[in-house]
């Protein structure tokens, strides 16, 4: 199947909400070795975000059930085995994405915008791995995630407007990484607040095409800040991500 057919297949799969098919089509496009267009890049990102998102959600549900079945060994064992099955799926998906990023996407990125997009993605998928990892492998995934986010962040500050939706989305996810993975609310709040304030200060640079995307992410940054700084924040509260 040629590239345009694969892209069309991915769009059909998206409309049918068959994200595994969508991801497979966009993986094949990426393996063609040609730099992706913005549209193709977004299709790839949406596909895998949904594929991995379903497993992240399932993993959280089953982990919670596993904790609640303490005292009932048989039920707990079933929950644990099911969690491990979901974990394996999640790890395989993340390995797929990280492989594509390393082999094709980051190397082929000719524009700063693309490089930041893919390095952010690398940070995201190592973060997803770190959520289910333990011991040495957790330390490694956390380190890899932080390095990818930091590399992306440095490029975005140098080469992109503070109102650019990719720069804002990176700040959003990097701040979530600080809060959830590094347990560092101060750094999370500082990063989110700086990104929000810098964007507000340059609202006149907002590109008409990306106005909706940028303002939505700014709203998510503000929501997270409100959540993180409120004293009576419950453990169950969930952060917004891009």
Curated annotation (Swiss-Prot):
<dbReference type="InterPro" id="IPR023409">
    <property type="entry name" value="14-3-3_CS"/>
</dbReference>
<dbReference type="InterPro" id="IPR036815">
    <property type="entry name" value="14-3-3_dom_sf"/>
</dbReference>
<feature type="modified residue" description="N-acetylmethionine">
    <location>
        <position position="1"/>
    </location>
</feature>
<comment type="subunit">
    <text>Homodimer, and heterodimer with other family members.</text>
</comment>
<dbReference type="Pfam" id="PF00244">
    <property type="entry name" value="14-3-3"/>
</dbReference>
<dbReference type="InterPro" id="IPR023410">
    <property type="entry name" value="14-3-3_domain"/>
</dbReference>
<dbReference type="GO" id="GO:0007165">
    <property type="term" value="P:signal transduction"/>
</dbReference>
<protein>
    <recommendedName>
        <fullName>14-3-3 protein beta/alpha-B</fullName>
    </recommendedName>
</protein>
<dbReference type="GO" id="GO:0008104">
    <property type="term" value="P:protein localization"/>
</dbReference>
<comment type="similarity">
    <text>Belongs to the 14-3-3 family.</text>
</comment>
<comment type="function">
    <text>Adapter protein implicated in the regulation of a large spectrum of both general and specialized signaling pathways. Binds to a large number of partners, usually by recognition of a phosphoserine or phosphothreonine motif. Binding generally results in the modulation of the activity of the binding partner.</text>
</comment>
<keyword id="KW-0963">Cytoplasm</keyword>
<feature type="site" description="Interaction with phosphoserine on interacting protein">
    <location>
        <position position="56"/>
    </location>
</feature>
<feature type="site" description="Interaction with phosphoserine on interacting protein">
    <location>
        <position position="127"/>
    </location>
</feature>
<dbReference type="InterPro" id="IPR000308">
    <property type="entry name" value="14-3-3"/>
</dbReference>
<dbReference type="GO" id="GO:0005737">
    <property type="term" value="C:cytoplasm"/>
</dbReference>
<keyword id="KW-0007">Acetylation</keyword>
């Amino acid at each position: 199947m040629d590239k345009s057919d694969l892209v069309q297949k991915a769009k059909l799969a998206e409309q049918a909400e068959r994200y595994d098919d969508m991801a497979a089509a966009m993986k094949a496009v990426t393996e063609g070795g040609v730099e992706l267009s913005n549209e193709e890049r977004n299709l790839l990102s949406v596909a895998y975000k949904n594929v991995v998102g379903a497993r992240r959600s399932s993993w959280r549900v089953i982990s919670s059930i596993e904790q609640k079945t303490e005292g009932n060994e048989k039920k707990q064992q079933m929950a644990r085995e099911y969690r491990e099955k979901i974990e394996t799926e999640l790890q395989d998906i993340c390995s797929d994405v990280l492989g594509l990023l390393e082999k094709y996407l980051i190397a082929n990125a000719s524009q700063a915008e693309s490089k930041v997009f893919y390095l952010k993605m690398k940070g995201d998928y190592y973060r997803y791995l770190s959520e289910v990892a333990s011991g040495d492998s957790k330390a490694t995934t956390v380190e890899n995630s932080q390095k990818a986010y930091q590399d992306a962040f440095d490029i975005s500050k140098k080469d992109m407007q503070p109102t650019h939706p990719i720069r804002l989305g990176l700040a959003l996810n990097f701040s979530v990484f600080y809060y959830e993975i590094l347990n560092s609310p101060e750094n999370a709040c500082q990063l989110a607040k700086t990104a929000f304030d810098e964007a507000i200060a340059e609202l006149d640079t907002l590109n008409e095409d990306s106005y909706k995307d940028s303002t939505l992410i700014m709203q998510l940054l503000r929501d997270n800040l409100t959540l993180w700084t409120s004293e009576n924040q419950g453990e169950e509260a969930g952060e917004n991500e891009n």
